[in-house]
């Protein structure tokens, strides 16, 4: 047949070629759609990895965690028929066993611990591990900056603002490198020593993280080595409690003694010199659930422990006696979020409660019988929403933070003159200063609390409080803002903030267990 001659196609051949054309068109459309969606093969292979070997960090020492939960077993292998009475009993027994295991995991342990027994992460505790040896928020939007400092006309106030605003984050490590606790931080504090910054933090699961902030970067980072791993500081993590550590305090009588209060219903004393943690208070019935929301040791008596509970009770306990000898007073029908003793007049107690009140109590006069036995109520002030904490300073002022988005400062500077049985009027209880402040922490951020510096060296009373825009605010007792501390590497709200007792060092913790430290 001549090559150029037209040939009439059969009906079958024509149909076959139409089907081929349709199939090819469909394939082309699919390829185009895949390319637009980014599913097709890339034109270039990934760049070859750098020939420079990457230094691997040594694997951290793993501590075996014992699982106390019962193991599931196969009913079929045991010959138990499905839906039989025997199978139902087996399922019920397994459910009870799992619930009991969960309860046992959360129940407090009353035994004394050596620190080496409760280290869960970081450096092992030994002689060298005693750190006391000398060796809606708008993230990052400032509400106080250096322009406010420059515009200050009062010379003394301006000097103080310049000083406090000049505090800098720990230069050796960024906050996102300093994971001081495994879980959300609830309590923060700095050891009273002035030799070096020694930071403690308590978290949601009962861990206590300890960071010696005098340590330096172990390895100098090479500028051209972008792949180098950033190692954080050495952290030691103890687990003295089985549930949230809500509050802790260094004893005013012994700086080696740290007292911690927990939702596991216990108070423990950690002896930092001996490396031992012992329970000093807990309900006499080990099954009683009495979560604690605060504790304090008076400067006048090293043996008396004051504490508050989430069910509105306030306790006084002589630690030399059995725990059932503790005096308990029902000061509120709702949760007491925090309390404090007047530093100079420790018979005066300020409580903040979910019932929206700040109340001042006088422990010198206790009257009534049974459940009605109470200290004398000096006065109370009601806010629009719940009050999270009440903190005395040594000048007789009380700072509170509440969900009505305010910080209130109440002036009771004449409290040293109050006779037993003094009753204040509503006008006397009104705050002298009200500072607008966003306190809407929500579910995932620890409640903001105003915390005074115990012994300011210049005599100017000041407190710090976390800021929802990822800063820490510092105010005077007159409500004047001194600084808004921030910096690079702060990726969450530093909600739990605390001053060093005497030095201008501020430590703050986040919901991810990270530490921010300004010095």
Curated annotation (Swiss-Prot):
The keyword Repeat applies. GO terms for biological process: DNA damage response; regulation of DNA damage checkpoint. SMART domains: WD40 (SM00320). Residues 35-92 are annotated as: Disordered. GO terms for molecular function: DNA binding. SUPFAM superfamilies: WD40 repeat-like (SSF50978). It comes from the Eukaryota. One of its GO terms (cellular component) is chromatin. Residues 78-92 have a biased composition (Basic and acidic residues). Pfam families: WD40 (PF00400). WD repeats lie at residues 240-280, 287-327, 331-371, 380-420, 442-485, 488-519. Keywords: DNA damage, DNA-binding, Repeat, WD repeat. Residues 53-62 have a biased composition (Basic residues). Belongs to the WD repeat DDB2/WDR76 family. PANTHER family: WD REPEAT-CONTAINING PROTEIN 76. DNA-binding protein that binds to both single- and double-stranded DNA. Binds preferentially to UV-damaged DNA. May be involved in DNA-metabolic processes. This is DNA damage-binding protein CMR1. It comes from Phaeosphaeria nodorum (strain SN15 / ATCC MYA-4574 / FGSC 10173) (Glume blotch fungus).
């Amino acid at each position: 047949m001549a090559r150029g001659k037209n040939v009439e196609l059969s009906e079958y051949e024509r149909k076959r070629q139409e089907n081929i054309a349709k199939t090819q068109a469909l394939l082309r459309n699919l390829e185009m759609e895949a390319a637009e969606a980014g599913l097709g093969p890339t034109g270039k292979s990934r760049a070859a990895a750098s020939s420079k070997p990457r230094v691997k960090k040594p694997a951290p020492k793993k501590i075996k965690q014992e699982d106390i939960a019962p193991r599931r077993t196969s009913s079929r292998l045991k010959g138990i028929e499905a839906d039989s009475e025997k199978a139902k009993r087996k399922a019920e027994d397994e459910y009870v066993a799992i619930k009991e295991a969960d309860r046992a995991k959360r129940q407090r342990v009353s035994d004394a611990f050596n620190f080496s027994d409760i280290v869960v992460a970081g450096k092992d505790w030994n002689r060298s591990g005693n750190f006391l040896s000398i060796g809606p928020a708008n993230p990052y939007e400032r509400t106080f900056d250096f322009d406010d400092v420059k515009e200050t006309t009062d010379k003394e106030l301006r000097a103080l603002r310049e000083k406090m605003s000049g505090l800098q984050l720990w230069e050796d490590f960024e906050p996102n490198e300093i994971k001081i606790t495994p879980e959300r931080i609830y309590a923060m504090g700095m050891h009273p020593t002035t030799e070096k910054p020694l930071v403690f933090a308590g978290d949601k699961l009962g861990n206590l993280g300890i960071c010696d902030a005098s340590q330096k970067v172990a390895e100098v980072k090479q500028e051209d080595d972008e792949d180098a791993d950033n190692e954080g500081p050495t952290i030691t993590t103890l687990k003295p409690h089985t549930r949230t550590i809500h509050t802790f305090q260094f004893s005013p009588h012994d700086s080696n003694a740290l007292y911690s209060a927990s939702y596991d219903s216990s108070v423990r004393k950690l002896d930092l010199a001996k490396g031992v943690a012992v329970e000093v208070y807990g309900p006499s019935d080990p099954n009683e659930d009495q979560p604690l929301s605060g504790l304090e040791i008076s400067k006048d008596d090293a043996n008396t422990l004051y504490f508050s509970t989430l069910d509105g009770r306030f306790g006084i306990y002589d630690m030399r006696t059995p725990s059932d000898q503790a005096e308990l007073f029902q000061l509120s029908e709702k949760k007491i979020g925090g309390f404090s003793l007047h530093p100079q007049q420790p018979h005066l107690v300020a409580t903040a409660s979910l019932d929206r009140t700040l109340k001042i109590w006088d422990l010198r006069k206790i009257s009534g019988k049974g459940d009605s036995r109470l200290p004398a109520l000096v006065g109370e002030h009601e806010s629009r929403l719940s009050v999270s904490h009440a903190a005395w300073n040594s000048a007789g002022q009380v700072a509170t933070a509440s969900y009505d988005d305010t910080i209130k400062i109440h002036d009771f500077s004449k409290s040293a003159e109050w006779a037993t049985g003094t009753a204040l009027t509503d006008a006397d209880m009104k705050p002298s200063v009200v500072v607008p402040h966003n306190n809407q922490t929500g579910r995932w951020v620890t409640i903001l609390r105003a915390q005074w510096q115990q012994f300011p060296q210049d005599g100017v009373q000041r407190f710090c409080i976390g800021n929802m825009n990822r800063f820490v605010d510092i105010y005077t007792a007159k409500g004047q803002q001194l600084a808004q501390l921030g910096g690079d590497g702060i990726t969450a709200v530093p909600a739990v903030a605390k001053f060093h007792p005497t030095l201008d060092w501020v430590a703050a913790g986040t919901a991810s267990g990270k530490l921010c430290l300004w010095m």
